[in-house]
Curated annotation (Swiss-Prot):
Region (Charged (hyper-hydrophilic)): 465-487
Assembly description: Homodimer. Dimerizes by parallel association of the tails, resulting in an elongated structure with two globular head domains side by side, and a long rod-like tail structure.
Any one Pfam family match given in the protein's UniProt record, by short name: Uso1_p115_C
Species this chain originates from: Saccharomyces cerevisiae (strain ATCC 204508 / S288c)
Record region (Disordered): 452-484, 1185-1221, 1326-1351, 1485-1547, 1645-1667, 1722-1742, 1762-1790
CC per GO annotation: cytoskeleton; endoplasmic reticulum; endoplasmic reticulum membrane; ER to Golgi transport vesicle membrane; Golgi membrane; Golgi stack
Name assigned to this protein: Intracellular protein transport protein USO1
Stretches forming ARM repeats: 45-89, 127-170, 173-213, 215-260, 261-312, 314-362, 363-429, 431-512, 543-584, 586-630
Coiled-coil portions: 725-1790
GO terms classed as biological process: endoplasmic reticulum to Golgi vesicle-mediated transport; Golgi vesicle docking; intracellular protein transport; membrane fusion; SNARE complex assembly; vesicle fusion with Golgi apparatus
Biased composition (Acidic residues): 1770-1790
Residues with Phosphoserine modification: 1770
Amino acid sequence: MDIIQGLIQQPKIQSVDETIPTLCDRVENSTLISDRRSAVLGLKAFSRQYRESVIASGLKPLLNTLKRDYMDEDSVKAILETILILFIRGDGHDDLTRGWISQQSRLQNGKYPSPLVMKQEKEQVDQFSLWIADALTQSEDLIHLLVEFWEIDNFHIRLYTIQLLEAVMATRPLKARSALISLPTSISTMVSLLDDMHEPIRDEAILLLMAVVNDSPHVQKLVAFENIFERLFSIIEEEGGLRGSLVVNDCLSLINNILKYNTSNQTLFLETGNLPKLAHLLSEPISQDEVFFWNDQRIVNINTALDIVSLTVEPGNTVTTKHQNALLDSSVLMVVLRLAFFHNIPKKVRPVALLTAANMVRSNEHAQLEFSKIDVPYFDPSLPVNSTANGGPIKLIPVVSILINWMLYANSVHTFDTRVACSRLLKAYFMDNFDLQRDFLLKQVQLCNNSTNNVGDNAKENGGSNKSDKESDSDKDTDGKDGTEYEGSFKANLFEVLLNYDAELNLNPFKLFFTTDIFMFFFQQDHKYSEELREITRNVTTGNDLEDEEPLKAIQTISELLTTSLTAADIRIPISYLTFLIYWLFGDFKATNDFLSDKSVIKSLLSFSYQIQDEDVTIKCLVTMLLGVAYEFSSKESPFPRKEYFEFITKTLGKDNYASRIKQFKKDSYFSKVDMNEDSILTPELDETGLPKVYFSTYFIQLFNENIYRIRTALSHDPDEEPINKISFEEVEKLQRQCTKLKGEITSLQTETESTHENLTEKLIALTNEHKELDEKYQILNSSHSSLKENFSILETELKNVRDSLDEMTQLRDVLETKDKENQTALLEYKSTIHKQEDSIKTLEKGLETILSQKKKAEDGINKMGKDLFALSREMQAVEENCKNLQKEKDKSNVNHQKETKSLKEDIAAKITEIKAINENLEEMKIQCNNLSKEKEHISKELVEYKSRFQSHDNLVAKLTEKLKSLANNYKDMQAENESLIKAVEESKNESSIQLSNLQNKIDSMSQEKENFQIERGSIEKNIEQLKKTISDLEQTKEEIISKSDSSKDEYESQISLLKEKLETATTANDENVNKISELTKTREELEAELAAYKNLKNELETKLETSEKALKEVKENEEHLKEEKIQLEKEATETKQQLNSLRANLESLEKEHEDLAAQLKKYEEQIANKERQYNEEISQLNDEITSTQQENESIKKKNDELEGEVKAMKSTSEEQSNLKKSEIDALNLQIKELKKKNETNEASLLESIKSVESETVKIKELQDECNFKEKEVSELEDKLKASEDKNSKYLELQKESEKIKEELDAKTTELKIQLEKITNLSKAKEKSESELSRLKKTSSEERKNAEEQLEKLKNEIQIKNQAFEKERKLLNEGSSTITQEYSEKINTLEDELIRLQNENELKAKEIDNTRSELEKVSLSNDELLEEKQNTIKSLQDEILSYKDKITRNDEKLLSIERDNKRDLESLKEQLRAAQESKAKVEEGLKKLEEESSKEKAELEKSKEMMKKLESTIESNETELKSSMETIRKSDEKLEQSKKSAEEDIKNLQHEKSDLISRINESEKDIEELKSKLRIEAKSGSELETVKQELNNAQEKIRINAEENTVLKSKLEDIERELKDKQAEIKSNQEEKELLTSRLKELEQELDSTQQKAQKSEEERRAEVRKFQVEKSQLDEKAMLLETKYNDLVNKEQAWKRDEDTVKKTTDSQRQEIEKLAKELDNLKAENSKLKEANEDRSEIDDLMLLVTDLDEKNAKYRSKLKDLGVEISSDEEDDEEDDEEDEEEGQVA
């Protein structure tokens, strides 16, 4: 039976997870094709719903079967279809393969959509499709197999393979393309698919070719050579041309992809006869054969066709002109222009047509000429399409004028792209054609001047139309009424828009934008002829001579129009004016002069830039930029000179504000939102008004981005320096050419020098051989040389004596300088003592004035203070005795004081560093305080919430107990009255307890702050008491002091006048140092006080932190105090920021002044030498006067010491009396108010003292001016020294430059260090703040947890109480209905209050979140600041490296110059030596001649041989003379060359060189005379030859020869004498030269030393000035802070006193009320006890008493909680509680 049932049962249904693997297994492993095919079809069925599992387990089997069964068409079709489904299915639940017909925008090519179109619309590829693509492209065999499937005739297989390859190209384009290219026949077969008869295959092949060709130049070339253009144009014709569907667009876009970025394909396209086809295609909408109706697809088709045209003429290629000519010859340009100016063309097509025409015309003169000949019918492009078709007669107008008209007046949002295209076409028409630009501007100027002429004539003049007479006649015929109206409406002039005022410009603001854009195009600086075009526009004038108006130039009129349009409704109008002016003025000096000629415009622009309006940010920034550019390119000769203009701007604007405005323009204005892409202007965004967001021209954007650094740093340039224009690329090329020429010349010179060097070496070898011969003759000259040495030794001794005398003089000078310095230091010390004495006199005078005023007030209160005066008179005696004792102690204290002053001066520097560290700690503590205050606010808010909740619950309990008692007392009238009183008492108790707790908290906080102020108050009260006690003393001593002060005052005034007269004549170079040291000693005490205050503050903050962690009460108490401190700290921070900014400005001004002074120093250095003598005489006189002043100062010091002793004695007596009078302070509190008034008078005196300090600062400035004057004189004297030492001026200048660069390096390094320190401090502060935040967050979280636990406890208690109250309600329901109603109403009110409190809690939580967000913002801003400072550090480091490179270059230049000078000197010395050697050789030759003549006398028979020897020697001498002459000539040439180099390097050596040259010329003359004499000797040699011939004939001629020899001897002797004289002269010249060189070296050394000293002194002075400026600023800031703190302390004391009085009054009143209420309670309780005894209804009373006991227990709990919280409960209340408990016990017993 079981077997039968198993057979009968149905088989189990197999799941999908089981079937798919089985199918995959069948596909891979089954042997029969039919089984594999059926398995593939099964997978195909599952592929739509179970895509993931099919891909995971069936992709490899499918691909393997495809390779195996590629011959079976059915299986191939099934496999390809399944893979396509898996590709296209998509990730989501929707099947994209089936719902695609409704989604796609094109017709469906077969069963499945094209994957490329899906990718374009979906724009995402899922992971599974990538998996399939990787599997297909893993080996190239699969791609090759798919290409082979195209040869199969089956439609479905071919279509599915194309779609599969599209899918692979969509997912993995690079791999698929490389696999296709690897097969040689793949592209040809792909292109052959275009000829397929099936349209789906053709369309999908077009899409596949688009993907394969895109961005692949190799494939582009392969496709282009497959005759693809003819095939595509034939497909376009079959589809109907531009009227066709998406297939036409696909064909055109495929052509576009083939031609893109491929010039060879472009030339092939143009040369293979495709232009007529393209022209025919484009002319279809214009043809009159058929009416052309437009739709979206046709617009897309024509735009892609126009894109093909513009691709062939891309700008920048070498083939563009050729292509432009081809397009012009094939009439494509005319077709495109007809499209652009055809009235039926849609608005989306017209701008594209205009842009393509611009590309065809750009930079082609032939095309531009042909373009200018075209006339076009006018119509308005902003009107609808069919409105102008039937609108009357047609008026022909030149193309240029209609383009200008459309650009300016086609005012519609929809035609903005046509306006842009018109401007582009105009620019292309004028591009690289200067003649057209010039003629156009001249005609525009004529039209502007002749504005009364007809517009039609203007149009003809502008465009230059070349129409025949017939056409003009036809135009005249068409003119009529309509023609006149038309001419009046037509406008095409740029100057009218630019220079005429238009009230309706707000309606068409882009009219001005486009005009300025075209003028900027004309004014491009890269343009060669831009200057001439600028001149033409600059000379255009406006204004009528008839109306007596001055004609204004173009820039002046534009600037006036700018001032009128600054507040225009549309912001584009002033922006276009401002950008145009900035572009014009930049680099144009003439234009800046025209702009600066009208000062009223500049003033109005400056006033506008400082109007307080937030909306005009871009305009204000552009106005400041215009002013800065005008300054950058102004000059001394401009109508508003450069220096005056600089001062005028910086007074109101300032450098920092200017730079910040330009940064703001770049980051926070409309400029920051500009899209840098040039084509973005064609499709701009729209603003709120509907206009496009286009504000700036591309030319202005380019200029600003390229020259932002120069524009930003315009005001930082020196006004005394003339501006430099921008260096063009052409000038750089010229310099490079010159550099190459010079390099070639240098190489040629090097070759020449090498050749000359070789020649000279050969000559040197010959000369060395001769030198050996001449060494023997040198011994003869030693005798003469010894005599010269003796003379030289005598001269050396004389030189030594002179040098010794010079050294003595220099030593004397040094001694005098040291004495002068010592005298000056003494003078300064005396001056400082005088200033101190003057200050002490002033303080005494002020003290007298205050004493007199106090005396008057004291005399008024004598009647009241009579009794006190008797006691004070007794105390006066004790005070006088103490005064005597204190005078003795005073002398000791003076000695100790002098020692302390020395030690204090040493400690000042250390304390300054400590102050800096304390300031840094203070800043950190401020940050901590701010964070703590925020957290305290948060915690206090939570505390208030919790306490309010507790109070509300307490009030509920109290009210409910009152209700229960009122219900019990309703039974009896007596109990009702008593319980009403008890309610009032309990309410007052609760309120009083709450108020007491609040007041106690306030009192605690006040007491803590009072303790902080008691120290300061005690010091003030001590001073007040001292003043009180000194009044009586001073009244007695007043007359004596007045008499003494009058006499001393007269003496002091006389002495001061004498000292001032003497000090004015003396040098006051270092007065500032002494004065500032005295000021530092004065401020030392103030700084110590500040340190103490800061330490106290630090201790207070630490105590507050500890108390905040211990208990939450103290947080609330200190909250208000911390808020006040926070406000004060914020004020201090703002004040410090303002002071820092002012100090920075002062530093910049001081640096400028210092630079000016350094420039003036050079002028005054020449006068120092003359005035040094005068000063030396005056110093001797001043020394005598100083001795007298020293004696007088000593006497003054003694008097001051006596006065100080008296003051100290008075102070000590007052302190002793203060200890005695502490008991009388309470009685004298009334007099404190009067003394406060006196304090106010003292404050006024302090202000007067501050004014006196300011007057002293003025005096210090005057003394600084005198110092500067004398420094200038010193600089003049140094100039005189330099005048004698100008021989090495260039070397010194280079040294100065290097030193300047080093100084700048040092300054930059110091700035870097400061910034690094700031960054480190910021980082440290940030770390500290973060650690504190984390710590406070932890504490706050813990406190929150505690508070939440308390809340939960309270909630539980409230629930328990509510349950108890509900029980009581049930009991009370038996009572009256009125009581229940009241009870319910009160409960509702309480619930409303709870809701209100919850809302307040939510608001506070939001505030806490806001504070957290602000903290995060602050941290982010700190991070940004750190990043900015790090970037600035990097830039500074780069600048430092550049400066170091400059220094190394300058050092190398200096070394090269020194080497050149040394080489020149050595060459001169060598030349002189060679000349001397040649002369010595001549002398030796003459001596040989003498010896030979003597031998001839002895041996007449050997005369022939001797004559031969003489001839040989003469010839050798002649050759030697010739060589010497040549060497001398070469030396002369070298000397001239060396002269030129020396003149360039050292100009002042010319005089010495001229002397040397004159001497050399004399020596040359002597040499020439010697030559002439030698020639005579040569002639005598010829006579000797005649004698030889006649010797055999006659002996008489021998005698004649002997006589002639004697004559020669005499001549030779004369020559020898002359040679000796010349040698002596040469030696003397050499000695003089050596002396001069030694003198030069000494002068150079002295110059270097003086320069080093001057530089050191200047650096020291600068450092001292900077130190004193910093110290002065710090002291001023500290004085201001102390004054503010003093005022705050006074105000706080008054406020505290008021608060204390109010608190005392309230506490007293409350205590009185509590006592009254306690008494009433006692009475009521006594009455209650009596009533309870007398009451009969014992049962009800027992119930009520039980309720009362419960309530009393709850009250006891709440009191215990109040005690835990710190609220004190009076003893009376506790007694009442005990009494109540006793009464309750008695009641229970009863």
